[in-house]
Structure formats: C-alpha cells, structure tokens
C-alpha cells in the first residue's frame, strides 16, 4: 500500500513521530506528541491506539511510542515528500525558506508518488532541503548528516573562538528563520562562537563581523 492511501491524520502522526526522533534522543510519548501538535491528549491517545492496531507503531501503556518497520517506511515517505516540495518551492518558484514549511504541509498530502519522483528528478536528486534537512531517497535511505547541535559545539571550556559551519536549521519557527537569514545565519554560513551561556541554551556568535545570540535550533560541524 502506498502512503497516499493512508488518511491525512495518519500521515501527519507518523511524520510527527519520525521528526521527534530525528531532532532528539528523548523517547516519544503521547504527551510529547500532544505538545508538538497542539492536539488534546484524548485525541492523541485515540490516534496512538489506532496506529498500534494498524501495525504502524509499538506502544506500551503509559510508555514510549516507536515506529514499526512498516510505520517507519511510511513516515520516511512523508518526510521525503515534504522536503522535496520545500526544495521545489524555493529553487523553482522562488519562495523564501521561511515560507515553505506550511505550504509543504498542505501539498504533501495531495501529491502522488509519481509526482514526487518527477520532482526528485527535476531537482537533480537533491540530498538536502533548503533548511539542510536530509532528503530520503526513493528506497527509504536517509542520508547521514555529520553534525551536532550548535550548543554542543560551543559547550565546555575554551568554547569561545570555536569556528563552525551551519549544516542544518529547524524550520519550526518561520519568524526565527527570517531573523537568521537577515543576519546571515543560513546553511553553509561559518560562525565563530564568541561566548557560551552556561545556564542557557543560547550562544553568542559572530558571522561576517556581526554578533548575534543563537538559540539551539541549528546543527553545525
């Protein structure tokens, strides 16, 4: 069965579960899904039961939620759709990187597998989207990204003066993306850590001579 045959709700839940595991090592729970989606716990709990009944996740009562092999395959298909659409919107239609997430959220449920493959070919089989996120291949392989959180790169003694290259930035906050772009903090930018904040996840960095404070939404190497 193609991922296109799943309901929009099921597609969304699988994608959210995948995304949560991609950005954090924290176990995924119904509570975390509720927080991420803004949906009521009762709705999430019902959805989790249905996903488990379909063999798409494994869920222990009051425990973590894990994708099965089948569920992972569908989730990766949705991630592939989303990131290829974002790339198409930026590279072909001239969208800015802060505009594409919500557009892709709508379009990813409507496109066919055939159209997704055509987009992939048209774009030259890109491996990363405009935010630096890896784009899964047609066979479900997710390209590895050798990077760590900026706050990890700037942690510890002697962090000040560390130079890093931005590899990836979360697209969860369009306003923050716009701020980053206006200040030259984009994928591929070289940053110098000027000061770490031991009791905060933010870091002070310098890019092209200008200083900025950066929250923990970017990955670097």
Residue ranges of predicted features:
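Conserved small/polar residues in nucleotide/adenosyl-binding loops
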Residues: 220-221
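Key DNA-contact positions within bacterial/archaeal DNA-binding proteins
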Residues: 42
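N-terminal helix-turn-helix DNA-binding core of bacterial DNA-binding proteins
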Residues: 4-39
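Basic, amphipathic "hinge/linker" alpha-helix immediately C-terminal to the N-terminal HTH DNA-binding motif
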Residues: 63-82
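Ordered, amphipathic secondary-structure segments that act as subunit-interaction surfaces
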Residues: 82-116
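A short, conserved structural fragment
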Residues: 54-60
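Mid-protein regulatory/catalytic core that forms ligand/cofactor-binding pockets
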Residues: 108-214
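Basic amphipathic alpha-helical segments that dock to polyanions
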Residues: 47-54
């Amino acid at each position: 069965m193609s991922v296109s045959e799943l309901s929009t709700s099921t597609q969304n839940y699988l994608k959210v579960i995948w995304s949560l595991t991609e950005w954090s090592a924290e176990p995924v729970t119904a509570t975390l899904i509720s927080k991420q989606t803004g949906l009521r716990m009762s709705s999430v709990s019902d959805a989790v039961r249905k996903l488990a009944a379909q063999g798409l996740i494994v869920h222990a009562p009051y425990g973590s939620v894990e994708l099965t092999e089948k569920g992972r395959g569908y989730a990766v298909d949705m991630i592939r759709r989303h990131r290829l659409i974002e790339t198409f919107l930026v590279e072909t239609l001239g969208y800015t990187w802060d505009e594409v997430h919500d557009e892709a959220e709508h379009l990813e449920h409507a496109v066919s597998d055939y159209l997704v493959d055509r987009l992939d070919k048209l774009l030259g089989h890109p491996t990363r989207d405009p935010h630096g996120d890896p784009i899964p291949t047609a066979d479900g392989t997710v390209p590895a990204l050798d990077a760590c959180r900026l706050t990890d790169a700037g942690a510890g003694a002697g962090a000040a003066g560390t130079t890093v290259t931005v590899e990836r930035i979360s697209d969860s906050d369009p306003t923050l993306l716009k701020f980053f772009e206006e200040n030259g903090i984009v994928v591929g930018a070289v940053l110098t850590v000027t000061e770490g904040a031991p009791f905060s996840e933010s870091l002070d960095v310098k890019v092209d001579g200008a200083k900025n404070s950066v929250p923990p939404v970017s990955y670097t190497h």
